[in-house]
Amino acid sequence: HLEPLSAADVQARMPAGHLWKGLSIKLEAEFIIREKIAPALKAAGSSLQNVVKCQVYLRDVEDFAPFNEVWAKHFPRQKPAVTLIPTATPGFFLEDARIEINTIALTDAGRTRKEIIDAGVATAFAGHSQAVRAGDLLFISGMLAADAGGLVKSARIDPAQPYFGSSVQAQMEAMLESAQKICRAAGTSLANVVRIQQYHTDLADFFPAYQVWERHLPAQHL
């Protein structure tokens, strides 16, 4: 497990006064992957090919697409599970930093092998893996209740009946349904979940979301 890494080098910054030397997010992402993550993995007997899960924190949602271009270049095949998480601005120990990444990987010489899981469910971003299995552990990419048309239909509140139904509960139902499909494809189930991370735009939605977990896994500690 690599601790969160941010970019703090001239190579990761736009030259002063230049407007067309690239995008800041691409420079930072490239630097972190090439100059920080890859060497750290090598020192630990691992490599980018054996990364199984990454959490990527981005301070600007407009950076998601250009970041994904850099990500796809470094992980053309056998992509790790990944979660992209928007933060506040500024959101890191460097005031002008745009990105931070933490990583979990297998050692190259270890017995455990990385297996990409495909359960046929929609990913939050095109080109991402749905999940990665590594031995007895299953790492699922960050999930959204979304499909090619945006927010899933079941979670769209009828403006004529704005207080009839709960969008957050419908979103949780959709995500847990997808998660269960992934678990089954990997030979396990939601009942074996050991860690959950939920990201809310409104913490008032936490309890309604938790109630959906209770329906799926009654009386189970989460």
Predicted features along the sequence, with ranges:
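N-terminal presequence-like segments and the immediate start of the first folded domain
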Residues: 1-53, 58-195, 200-222
